[in-house]
Amino acid sequence: MKLCAVIIASLLVCVAVASSSDNQKEFAQEKEMTREETQSLGEHEKDDEVTGSEERSCIEEWKTCENDCECCGMSTLCAASWVDGHQIKLCRNEGGKLKKVLHFIQKSVSKIKSCRK
């Protein structure tokens, strides 16, 4: 019975942590400065000529990135992997926090059921 109580308590903690990390990510995105605010107009026009019509607001999945804020979508993260001794950062869809929380709930329920046997 104590194990079941511990599992339920850990489930509640995980849900609280998942919701607070989503709030932190939204806060970081609100505070991020736009390209126009950080560069002069001349530099911005020069970059447009070099890159053409490339979209800068967000990077699509499986393209290179520097941090999570650059990737499109809430569940997409900038994940690092090593290829031939070099670190490459790519935007990857990690399935989101909700999917991980639901999977944890499913595992917890199955453990609670096994506690009762």
UniProtKB/Swiss-Prot annotation:
It is found in: Secreted. Its main location: secreted. GO terms for cellular component: extracellular region. Residues 21-56 form a propeptide. Residues 23-55 have a biased composition (Basic and acidic residues). Keywords: Disulfide bond, Ion channel impairing toxin, Knottin, Secreted, Signal, Toxin. Residues 1-20 form the signal peptide. GO terms for molecular function: ion channel regulator activity; toxin activity. Expressed by the venom gland. The presence of a 'disulfide through disulfide knot' structurally defines this protein as a knottin. Putative ion channel inhibitor. This is Hainantoxin-XV-5. It comes from Cyriopagopus hainanus (Chinese bird spider).
